[in-house]
Every structure is written in structure tokens, then in C-alpha cells.
Amino acid sequence: MFPGAWLCWVSLLLLARLTQPCPVGCDCFGREVFCSDEQLADIPPDIPPHITDIVFVETAFTTVRTRAFSGSPNLTKVVFLNTQVRHLEPDAFGGLPRLQDLEITGSPVSNLSAHIFSNLSSLEKLTLDFDRLAGLPEDLFCHMDILESLQLQGNQLRTLPGRLFQSLRDLRTLNLAQNLLTQLPKGAFQSLTGLQMLKLSNNMLARLPEGALGSLSSLQELFLDGNAITELSPHLFSQLFSLEMLWLQHNAICHLPVSLFSSLHNLTFLSLKDNALRTLPEGLFAHNQGLLHLSLSYNQLETIPEGAFTNLSRLVSLTLSHNAITDLPEHVFRNLEQLVKLSLDSNNLTALHPALFHNLSRLQLLNLSRNQLTTLPGGIFDTNYDLFNLALLGNPWQCDCHLSYLTSWLRLYNNQISNTHTFCAGPAYLKGQLVPNLKQEQLICPVNPGHLSFRALGLDEGEPAGSWDLTVEGRAAHSQCAYSNPEGTVLLACEESRCRWLNIQLSSRDGSDSAAMVYNSSQEWGLRSSCGLLRVTVSIEAPAAGP
């Protein structure tokens, strides 16, 4: 805002204060009054009649007397924030026929009588958060026929009367989080057919009765996180046809019935983070085709069934981090074509199948950090065209020939990929080196002795046409690299890594049976293939045999 406009606005506020009466200890702005004077001993009796909103902040009076606001019939909003109010007399808010929003937050109110709210028939929102309420009368809300939002978070409620919410048929939001509830009475929510959000987070619930949520057919968001739930009834959610978001994290759930989520066709968000799950039943998410976000992190999963996510074709985010997963089936992510974020960090993965991510063409963020990976198979990222964030840190990477695909891929997309900093764990001479900075010639694999065939034609222009059969120490491969010189007279086929370690032993030349023959020759070739350039030098010395 420009300085001139700001000064103009402040001037108007000051002018408004000067031209209208305002209670002592309060500030008035148009139709709003803010009272924050610690010396204020009671509700001001001289609140202007045109005021619609009044807010008390950190005031010291402890009692709201009967019909304390009766001189202000136009009030629609009354708020007490962090005040010392601890007692509300019967009909404390009587005489407020237009009151729609009442809030008492952070006050030491510990109990309420049944008649405190008896005349608030226009109330739409009631907030009693972070007070000291230990119990509620069963008929406390019986006259609030049009109440839409009820906030009871952060109190000390241990139980709920069975008929407490019976008259709240228009209720849309109910917040009971951060209390001490250990159980829910049967039918407690039976009349709340229009409820859209229910928060039961951070209580002490160990189980939920079979029909506890049975009538909530309009419910869209359900918070059950931060409790002590160990098991869930197979039909607990069977009537929640409208449910879109479900929070079950921070519990102690060790088993999920296969039919648990089968009625939740509109579910888009599911968090099972921080439970005690060891397995996922096959078909658990078979009926949740609309799911977009799924978190299974901080459990004890050791593997994932191949068909676990088969029907989740719209899934955007999947979190499997902080488990004990050692192995992932080749096709476990096969149908996740819309997946953007995949977290596999902090598991025990030692190897990944080359085709594991092949259908994830929209994948942008992949976290593989803090596993036991020593290498990655060739081609594993070839279809991940949108990948820009790849976390690899905390793996024991062996920087030898088997890591050549990863280093080449990182160099190729160096300007597009972030978060790739990770270090070699071996071999010893590369330990601590940054993997993305390695050169191809540094990635060497030792070769175990074996047999490899090598065929050279026309070693020297002066030699007659013919061939030499050479025995080469190195393992004979079903070759991926076929090297040749430009003339095609020298052919060498071997694995890329093993062509670096050749020890050649010559057998007798075909047709040569002269023991007295002396032969000296040396030849160098530059051989090329799709694997790169290989330089080969062969020196042959055949001294005459003794008599």
C-alpha cells in the first residue's frame, strides 16, 4: 500500500474512533470492538448497539454473567481469546438473537451447564478450543438446530455422552482432536448425516466399534491419526461412500483387512504412515481407482506384492520410505503412469530390476537415498523423461564398470537433474569421489581368468593370407561389444569391461611345423564398437627351438 493511502486509512480509523462512543478498555473500528485491557473487570455494559463483532483478548475478568450482552442485540460474533474466563452463568449469551459465531479459546473453563447456550438458535459456529473441559452435558447443544461447525479441540474430554450430537443435523464440521478419548459411544454420530469433516486426531482411541461411523454417508475428510489403534474392523468404512481424505498415520496398526477400503471409491488421499505394517494384502487398494496420494512410510514392510498398486492408475505420489524393503517385484509400479513422486529412501534395497521404472514416464522426483545399492542396471531411467530430482545419497556405490550406465546418464542430463550428489564407497582408490564427476575410464572391473577367442587376419602385409588362433585369458562372453579395425581384418568380441584385461597366449601357427623357425612381429590396432574405442597391441616373438 502507498504511504499516502496508508495514512488516509489510519486517519479514517482514528476519525471513526473520535466520532463514536467506545467502552473503556476497548478499541472500536466501524462495527467491530477489540477489548484487551487487563484491567477490564467485566463485560462492558455500554457496547454501542450497532456493533456486530466483539473480541476479548487476554482480559482478566473470570465470569460472563447472565445476559451479559443483552444491550447489544445486533452482535453476530463474540470471541474470547486467552482470557481468564472460567465460569459462564446460565443464559450467559441470552438476548443475542442474531449471534452466529461464538468462540472461547484458551480459557480455563472446565465445565459447562446445560442451559448456557439454551437461546442460541441462530448459532452456526461454536468454538471451544484449548480450554479445560473434562465433560459435556448430554443436552448442551440441543437448541442449536442450525449449527454447522463445532470445534472442541485441545480439551480434556475422556468420554462423550451418547446423545450429545443428536440435534445437530446440519453439522458439517466436528473437531474432537487433542482430547483424552479412549472410546466412542455406539451411535454417537448417528444423526450427523450431513457431516463432511470429522477430526479425532491425537486422542487415546485403541479401537473403533463396527458401526461407529456407519451413518456418515456425506463424510469427506476423516482424521484418525495420532491414536493407539492396533486394528480396524473390515467394515468400519463401508458406509463412507463420499470419503475423499483419510488420515490413519501415527497409530499402531499391524494388519489391514483386505476389504477395509473397498467402499471408498472417491478416496484421493490416504496416509498410513508410522504404523506397524509388515505386509500389504493383495487387492487392498483394488477399489480405490481415484487415489492420488498414498503414504506407507515408517512401517515395517519387507516387500510389496506385485499387484499391490495395479488399479491405482491415477496415483501421483507414492511414499514407501523408512521401511525394511529388500526387494521390489519387476512390475510393482507397472500401471502407475501418472506417478510424479516416488520415495523409496531409507530401506534395505540391494538391487533394482532394469524395468522397475519403465512405465513411469511422468516421474519427476525419485528418492533412492539411504539404501544398500551398490550399482544400478543399464537402462533403468531410459523412459523417465520428466525426471529432474534424483536422490542417491547414502548408498554404498561401487564405482566400477557396473556403474557406467549411471555415470553416463548423470553426465548426459547434468544440467537438468538436481539432488544427485553421492559418493563412491569403493573401490578403495575411488572412495569418497563424487559419482557424477567420474570419468568412464575410471570405472574398471577386474577379470577372472577364463577363455576368450580372438581372430586376427593378415598381421603384416608381407605375410601370406591366413590366420592366427589366439588363446586369451579373460572370460568368454556372450559379447555385447564387437570391436574391429577399419579394414575389418581384426575382430575382437568381449564384454566391455573385460576387454581392458587381456593376457594373450599364442598357439602354433597353422601349417608351421618347423622347429627352427624364428618369427618376430608387433602390431597395434585401434578397434571401435558401439561400446567405444579399444587400443590393442600384440607383440609376437617366436625363437628357434633347441635341438
From Swiss-Prot:
Main location: secreted
Glycan-bearing residues: N74, N111, N119, N266, N311, N348, N359, N367, N520
Entry's localization field: Secreted
Keywords, in A-Z order: Glycoprotein, Leucine-rich repeat, Repeat, Secreted, Signal
The keyword Signal belongs to this UniProt entry's keyword annotation: yes
Coiled coil: none
GO cellular component entries: collagen-containing extracellular matrix; extracellular region
Sequence ranges assigned to domain LRRCT in this UniProt record: 395-447
Span of the signal peptide: 1-21
Function: The 83 kDa subunit binds and stabilizes the catalytic subunit at 37 degrees Celsius and keeps it in circulation. Under some circumstances it may be an allosteric modifier of the catalytic subunit.
Name under which the protein is recorded: Carboxypeptidase N subunit 2
Species the sequence originates in: Mus musculus
Source species taxonomy: Eukaryota, Metazoa, Chordata, Craniata, Vertebrata
